[in-house]
Amino acid sequence: MICQLLWHEHNSMGSGREKKIRKLGDNFSLPYLKFDCDHNDKNYRASNRPFGLSTGLSVQLNASNMTDPFKFLLDNWHTIFKNGAIKLLPPEGWQIPVVLDQGAFEFQSKRQCLNKGCLNYEKNYDYFKKLKAFHESRGLYFYHPPIIGNRPVDFLRLRNAISKFTNSGSSLNNEILHKVIIYLRLEDTKEVRQVLTRCYDRYIKPFERDSSPSFKSKRSESSTRKIRNTRSSAQQESPIPETSAQSPVQTIQVNGSTSLKRPLIERGEQCEYCGLDKNPETILLCDGCEAAYHTSCLDPPLTSIPKEDWYCDACKFNISDYDPRKGFKWKLSSLKERSAEIFNTLGERNSSSKLTNLTEDDIELFYWSSLAESNSGFAPLELEGLSQAYTSTIQSSLPSKEVFPLEKYSSEPWNLHNLPFENPCLFNYSFSDLSSLTITRLSIGMVFYTHGWTKSSLSTGLLHHHRFGDTVTWYVLPPDESDAFERYLISSYPQYTMEDLNRSNGLPVIVSPSSLIENGFHPIAIDLRPNEFLVVSPNSYHMGFHQGFSSFESVNFATVNWIKDGLLNSSISVLKSMRIPSSVSYEAVIISMVLSKNPCFSSEWLIKCFEDMIANESASKNEIMKLVPNIQALKLESSVPLEIRCSNCKQPCFLSFMQCHEPKKFICLGDCVKEVSLNATSWMLFYRWDVHELSNLAERFVSLIRGPEEWTNRLRSVLSTSPKPQLKVLKSLLVDAEKAMLTTPETVNLRDFVQNANSWIDSVNECLKVASLKRKKDKKPPLFKAHDHWNNTSNLKDSAVLFKVLQTSRSMAFTCQEIENMKQKAFDLLEFRNRLINSFSGPLDKNTCQRLLTEAELLGFTIPELGIIQKYLIQFEWLDMFYSFETTRTTDSDLERLITYGVSAGIPEDNDYMIFAKAMKGRAEIWENQVYDTLSKSNISYDKLSLLRDEAMNLCVNKELFSKVVGILNNAEEIKNKIATLCERSQEKDFALRPSIDEVKEALASAEKLPILSESTVTLQKMYDVVLEWIRRGKRLFGKANAPLEILGQHLDYVEKRNSASLSLNDRPGPPMEPASRETSPDSEGRLTIRKKKGCIFCFCRLPESGVMIECEICHEWYHAKCLKMSKKKLRQDEKFTCPICDYRVEIPRLSNRPKLEDLQSLYKDVKLLPFQPKETETLRKVVDLASKFRQEMQALAHNPFGLTMAEVPLARFYLRKMEGAEILLVDETNLFRQKLHECVPIAPNPPPIIGESKSTRKPRPTKRQRQIMKQVAEGLLPASAIAPPKSSNEKKSSNNVKAVEAETKSKSEKSPKKNGTNISDANNKNESHVSLMKNWKLGSPAFVTLVKEKNSSCLCGEEFSPRDSFIDCTICERRFHYDCVGLNNEIADSVSKFTCPICMEQSGGIYPWQLRPRNGMHPDHISGFSKEVETDPKLGSSGYTLNNSKFDKAAVSKTLSAQDVSRLQKVSCGEHLYFGTDVFTPLGDMATSASMFSLDDSSEKTDAFTENFLNV
């Protein structure tokens, strides 16, 4: 019951605020701080200190001391208590890191006045409150003093400073103000003088005059003035309230309750100083807090309302909660700098002092001399720092387990966070809130920051840990001089009482060591440096100051001496007599120590303390019962809180208390005797435990302490009774010893004996242990489970082990049940062996063997005769396994295991069953080899694989390999059926029912993954190639032969989109339209063009307005600048523009070739002949249908028998514009309309030429071969001339020949007849001219041969051969030529078995099929005087060379090259012919459109017989 109550209350306490887990590396460290002491420093003072003081004892800690701090403290407690304090030096290298973020850590400081009288600013704060209350009672309200130098004025310091130089009540003149400013260390300015004068005249002077005795006597004679509110007589007689609890604000009665008067008026309606709302035009509102002030009430006053934002002093300086005790907010770096400034200021005051190379003695003397000067001619020095701030409200400098769990020093025993919670610390045995003692306190101070004389709370020990910075000097008095020192303090400072000493654990006063020595005290001095500890004993007064910027952390601790020496009891008695609350209950600590059963507390002194406490409690209850015999006594429930305090002595009532109902209060039993009005009706007695329960607890505790002797007697009695005692009796004695936590030698010996006995018994149990007959589930086939079951005897133990252990049991010094069980097991084993030997005399069968082995398993031991039975049983089981053999279920591994088991079981090799099993294994291996050999081939035979599958049905083969074979066959059959279905569907008469090309592509991809190649797959591939050839044909129509196959569908979508706008039948002819972004402009006759508001379309593309628009000056049609590839930067406002419709010479930018409508119709017509449906069919149909409908729409206008008149010119322009914007070419209509427009409205000097094709104007991309050349040039494999060959002299001569060709062509075109007023050339004449020109081009002329010989090279280019060049030899003349010079590449060269050069080909009368590209840039036309008569080489037949057509025919049959084969070779080199003498990136097909050049490719693109055959192929 007692334990449950205490631990319930303990666990219900809060765990504190949650802390964020951090890493030590996240903090910023300042480099100039000291974190460790230097033990070799000569400045360590041991003797000859100032004032003749002796230095305190220093102890060097070792490694063992660092692991158990309380053991060290208990061992050295006498020394600590005798000296009052000692200093501890940790080992070298031991240092707890500072976890403060030294760059961002910020704290609110506490101001300190370096003065003997008082260190803190309590008097200043009290004076300010009295002054404020005095003026508020007279209607002058203010919340903070005026501001000087960004700091509020300290009224008390100002009053003391003025009183030094003048009498109270007198006025201030300039001389006095000057002295006061110097005394207060202020800047002597006019504004400062005005503020000081107003503060004195307005605030201090009236208060001091009213507080003077003469003024009080005069006021008592006068009548009491009338005031609005009703006050008590005591308040009227005392004009100055003594405490802040008395409110000077006027009150009124509202609904029967007292309330303040001022809140009845909202803030901002009356002045904060005078409390009046008069003269509202002079009231100024603060833009921060909306407070109102009269401009005349401000200090200093304002003459007018400021126009800009105005803030009161409370908002400007953040002093709405003014408290002179509070300092600024500091960071470590700024406080260190301020400390240096203060030290320099003190040096300037005493010019004789040297501030450089000061020792600690010099600084100590300097401190006391500065303190003496503060009481003379200078004002006391103001210091700031942090004194004993709880780390629960501010960050600690020590790592804790909650915030830094990964830091090793977080668990260090000497870490102040862990010290109060160590097991020996008595703070763990109090169930009250001891956070004021267990939470560490951080102190940070600048130079000379002082910690006044104080002692630890509740007579506990105190531990200081210097964290970083300069030295802190401490003065300590022994504990036996504490009482005398308290009397000395009270006599020296009568304003303080003994209650002040005990309430604050000291006074904020400074007593110099010299004064202490003069009065008979014996102080010691200790210099605490970084990383050092200072242990202060209980009841020892100590005082310290900082010799520079430094910081230390402190915490309380309590050892067993806290109770043993009566320190806690005496401390609580003192607090009780002074009615000062205490946080610890002496009774709760005693009971908690008793219930803990800690061996550290198992002493006679705790028994005496516990018995004395019970005696006092019993005496107090008996006294109460005598005074009030009929008083009701109730036992407290466990839910009643432990913190119940006495109303008189303010101490916690833990064991019992008296409660009064009216008025309700609690009184302890000790104070209850002093109550006069004790009666049974209004008082009740409550207790947690009665005397009987406490007595039982004391008896158990006494038995716990005195139990070891009793237990030893019991052990001796058991050992003397029997030489071999029972082991369970010894174990029972050991359990009792462990419950009592005994540590006697007998207990240790018995524990070792029992442990050895238990280990021996474990070995006996392991020997007697029988393996379980339940076996785990096995994945093996059933036919092998029986064999493994009887073949595995590893779980059976050897019987010799049992008899050996039985022999060792005779030497054991105890008896137990396990020894008897072992004897019985040995008897059973001997009996089983006899029965096993008798079974050999008769016949053995399978059942008999199984029964004997089962009995052996039950016993758990094996004997030599058991192996014979096991061998017989295994052979029986193997035969059963063979009979249960099935080929469909058994794998090759099972068959191999069967053979292995048979050999291990002793089955002869000539046994019929063994011979059959090995034969099956051999057949399985042959089958497996055949399968692997078949699968390793690139083309697998389906029939052979089917035979292997059927053969495996009667063999024991690898099931995975068999499944693979079956899977291949199933997939092949599935794909075969799928291909057959596709081929069957391809013969459908309805083209819509034929399969799509995607289905075919998917089927071919699936077939490629299989190693089986069937004839149906080859057939389907050929049909698929037909569709691909149709797609390539469509690509060539649009000039995209080198593009991927998918480009046809994409481009057809683009064509369909463009044609749907340009060839739209909804677009009807009409007058020119004006863009919406432009005003209407007149036409050539001054008429305004019609401008539609919506649906206006322009340009060839017949799309709405977009971007920059250009107007034609002839037809006034608007065009998109981007359609004409015109940049806005190159256009001028006054520039005139003629569209390509009006002037055919203006080029229209084309992104791709425009095929003829007839070619697209033919392409669409051939779709019906394809076996599969291309994806582009529907789009092609839409394009052809739209163009056909548009052509029918123009039939009437194009075939008008009366010709074109001027009235129909806009109509002709309209249709021609639509045709030019389309992506297909209407050849007849386009030529007709261009000729008619030129005839009616001629702009160009010559009529437009007849066009038969529409090529792209876009600069072509480099081909694959050209990209390879660029890469080889970049890598240095080819010279730069391969890309841009230099001009030669032959290139200059070429211009004359070109001009001759142009003249000849032009003369023929001019002589052509005219039809319908249009200059149309005869196509037949044109073709004939091209053929004649091609026939006149000969390479075998003597001039060309001579030029080659002059170059001393066999190639056309005349250049020398390099090792990197690719070359080929002619089979006739044996000349050597470069690949690129004769128009070859690697693919062509590999396909040609015999090569005939261009010269030999020309001499034999043949046509060289490839384009010549000499490296020197020479064009064949550049060579004059080509021979027209060619001698035929008798070695050559009708063909120039033979072609190895291995890439086109699988039979690889060599045949003679004919004109039809040229197309195939031309396709091999498609897109790689380069024009001579031009840039290497310009393909010949684009250069052929130029009017100034003519080449072989030009002739190949005309409609002669050769090109017709080429295009058809």
Swiss-Prot record:
Region described as Disordered: spans on this chain: 211-253, 1063-1086, 1244-1268, 1280-1327
Localization annotation: Nucleus
Pfam families: ARID, JmjC, PHD, PLU-1, zf-C5HC2
Zn-finger region bounds: RING-type: 1096-1143, 1354-1401
Gene Ontology molecular function, alphabetical: chromatin binding; DNA binding; histone H3K4me/H3K4me2/H3K4me3 demethylase activity; zinc ion binding
Name recorded for this polypeptide: Lid2 complex component lid2
Complex formation: Component of the Lid2 complex composed of ash2, jmj3, lid2, sdc1 and snt2.
Record domain JmjC: where: 408-574
